[in-house]
Amino acid sequence: MTNLPSLSQLEESVHDALNQRLKKEIIQSGGSISFSLLMDIVLYDEEHGYYTGYKEQFGEPGDFITAPMISNIFSRCFLNSFKENFVHLPSSILELGAGNGQFAVDLLIAAEKNNILIDRYLIYEISNNLVKRQQKIMQKELSNEFFSKVEWVSEVPEKFEGIIFANEFLDAFPTNIYEIKNKQIFERKVGIENNQLDWKEDDKPNLELAGIIDTENLPTGYIFEYSKNLDEWLNKFFKIIKKAMIFFVDYGFCQNELFHQDRTEGTLMCHYKHHAHANPFAFLGAQDITWHINFSHISRLAKIAGCKVSGFVSQANFLINAGALDFLSEHDPNNISDFKIQTNAFQRLTSPAEMGDLIKVIGIAKNTDVSLLGFNKNDRKLQL
């Protein structure tokens, strides 16, 4: 924590306001609250929340950079896969949580340039602040014709048919934190210690999770995340869509990788001014809080809902399968400055040391045939 930047005066006032609200919630709840409630408040509070308040989250002035911001290769590769799936589906796209809007901008520009029909581009976004930013960049970058195809929705449309895409959407759902002790599961709640927010272990083991998580080989002290909020949202989501190919892109693992004896401290991560750390009680409302997705669990929920898992690959494999090297080859190596920028961007997207292996792509189909472009090599769905 000592190497992290200092809060601005505005950020300090936001932190203090959220800190007081959380302490009040803890006192009113008898001494502790779930971590998911803390996460919900600090990320989504109407006035002070990280995503819903004043904060600039993305790019150099923000706290982190997402894949679409690195290069339009990312969006163009997904458009290649979407185009193949439009053979079986209406030419409509629903993006869940569009961030700063860069993915939609790059995809729609490429679609117009290559005469790929897009009937509608829907964006599901709960943050009015982000909607305004997305509208601003799209109105600036898109032609009038393609901007007119974009529509913002506050609920996932029932009986939607088309492509559904989500990049770093699942890991923003509030999650609870749990710890293994003598093969039993205890929730790590949030309490007050010495007038500061701190972890507080629940007194009783969580029997509900015992039937979901196999704790037999997990050591005492092992920490993990589980989001009932995400489960409930996905169960409803899979039920209401009618016919779709779904692409979830996020940091995460198969269950056997996630629940490994060497991964004992959980995956909770905070980002502030491009610094990563693991203290969720610092910089309230000024930092992002995320966790890594259990893709095996996502797969199970999808199958229970009658969907089919079409593929599961690393981001690097998806992009290369879907044409990233072809897009890179469009740039002239003799233009040293431009080519260096493009190759560096490609490395960030595909390198195992960067996003390439840490981020995964899962394809889920409901009531449709699918094209496997993006998943056609190095598919790991059998490991889920």
Pin down the residues of each PLM region:
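Short helix/loop capping segments that flank catalytic or ligand/cofactor-binding pockets
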Residues: 51, 172-175, 257, 371-373
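Generic beta-sheet signal
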Residues: 91, 162, 244-247
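Long, Lys/Arg- and hydrophobic-enriched amphipathic alpha-helices
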Residues: 211-384
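A residue-level signal for conserved active-site and pocket-lining positions in enzyme catalytic cores
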Residues: 42, 164, 298
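A mobile, often basic/glycine-rich helix-loop segment
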Residues: 165-211, 261-271
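Rossmann-like AdoMet
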Residues: 1-96, 100-160, 317, 323-326, ...
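Conserved RecA-like P-loop NTPase ATPase core
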Residues: 74, 164, 250
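Short, glycine/acidic-enriched loop or turn micro-motifs at the edges of active sites
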Residues: 128, 170, 253
